[in-house]
Amino acid sequence: MNLKQFPRHSLTFGPTPIHPLSRLSESLGGKVELYAKRDDCNSGLAFGGNKTRKLEYVIPDVLAQGADTLVSIGGIQSNHTRQVAAIAAHLGLKCVLVQENWVNYSDAVYDRVGNIQMSRIMGADVRLVSEGFDIGIRPSWEEAMESVRKAGGKPYPIPAGCSEHPLGGLGYVGFAEEVREQEAGLGFRFDYIVVCSVTGSTQAGMVVGFAADGRADRVIGIDASAKPEPTRAQILRIARHTAELVGLGRDITEADVVLDTRYGGPEYGLPSAGTLEAIRLSARLEGMMTDPVYEGKSMQGMIDMVRRGEFPQGSKVLFAHLGGVPALNAYSFLFKDG
């Protein structure tokens, strides 16, 4: 497997830290050791996150093509579009963001705080669109690219979550390689890796990266889309493509893609009582913030699996913290009492 063949434009601080979640582990019985790898702290570009790691492999193509405008898409509180806006500002590029109404949630300031607020501050052309949630290619995004062309610009398309981009899975192959290097220093290997999945390329990259040492099916995806079958299919497709790109040397099978569908509800972007409990528990025991859309749901899944005894006693479980905390402001009503 060869990731070094692909050019990478550094946007992150370097390897993200891994630290124990000792108080959380103890509160859940102490039979499973929980750790977190902090990709939520990976960059100085508007707080970074998992999309920043992915975009390190996309930006060389942007620059090679001579594009002058990054065009991307997400929900109103998209972490991805905030990271695209930050990178555009950092590189001196223009940025057009299509922000669709993906979440069935009403808050007086939902479209004015958090991620979308930062994107506007960074100078992005933010375009609110009424269409609902879908992880596929969207007409509104294609229309935005055409508008840039008509204005004389040269757009570069970055799909939702960077997932449909041909290079979108590479960053999290690198994540797996990074974990292996850190494991050598820690003196042990993680038995399971827990990660949130919606558009799919984060888990897909991990599946390929950990397949190199036989742990593909130890990557436990927690679905947060509440539409798990399209998500599962997209993870598998991206993983197979990425495996070919890096020369994994074996096929990725359906058995390699583990997606737990118990925690995505009630809808995309809407937290359950269990999600809110997980957000508060990790915050109050570890000072580690998670969000209602993504990481709160994967944290809920990990906590529930420990409580149910689904990880064997003595397991070491790595929680991949992908970011998402800037969206908390948009859900302020849910946390008015803490």
Swiss-Prot record:
Keyword DNA damage: no
Residues annotated with N6-(pyridoxal phosphate)lysine modification: K51
Residues at the catalytic site: S78 (nucleophile)
GO MF entry, a single one: 1-aminocyclopropane-1-carboxylate deaminase activity
EC number: 3.5.99.7
GO BP of this protein: 1-aminocyclopropane-1-carboxylate metabolic process; amine catabolic process
Role this protein plays: Catalyzes a cyclopropane ring-opening reaction, the irreversible conversion of 1-aminocyclopropane-1-carboxylate (ACC) to ammonia and alpha-ketobutyrate. Allows growth on ACC as a nitrogen source.
Family: Belongs to the ACC deaminase/D-cysteine desulfhydrase family.
Assembly behavior: Homotrimer.
Name of the protein in question: 1-aminocyclopropane-1-carboxylate deaminase
UniProt organism field: Cupriavidus necator (strain ATCC 17699 / DSM 428 / KCTC 22496 / NCIMB 10442 / H16 / Stanier 337)
